[in-house]
Amino acid sequence: YSSITPAHTRDSHPDLIPVVRDLLKTWAARTGGLYIIENVPGAARVMENPVKVCGSAFGLGVRRHRYFESNTFLTPTECFHEQQGRPIGVYGDHPQEDEDYRRPDGTRRGTKAKTVEHGREVMGIDWMTDWDDIADAVPPAYTHFLGTQLLDRLETAA
C-alpha cells in the first residue's frame, strides 16, 4: 500500500496497515510478542513512528527506502547516497536492458537492473530466481538488521 498509489490500481493495493496493526497489537498484548510492519515510503504517513532503512547503509547497490513500524523501539539506518553512487533500481515487471530508460514523465530514478542476476546481486539475494519475487523483496540485510534488534529486546526482557 502507498498513499500515492494511483486511484485505478487501489483495488489491487488496499491499505491493510490499520487492520494488520490491530491484529498484531491484539496478539502482542496476549503473548508479549514483538512485531514489525514493513512498507514503502508512500505509506509512512499512515504508519506509527516508522523508521527508515536504506540499502546504502549496507553497501547494497539499491537504495530501496523502506519504512518499518514496530511495538518496540527500532534504530533506523543512515543513508550514504554519496558514497553509494548511482543506485540500481529493482522494480516493475521486468529488468531493463536499455541504459537510457526513463519514466513516462521523462525523469529517471537511476539505472534499473538489467537482468534477474543483476537484481539479485544488488539486493544481496542469492536464492530467488523470479524477477517479480526480487522486485517485491525486502533485502535480507534489512531483515538481519531489524531482526537483531528484536532479538536484543527479547534477550533484555528475559
Residues of each region from the PLM?
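Conserved active-site and SAM-binding loop architecture
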Residues: Y1-A158
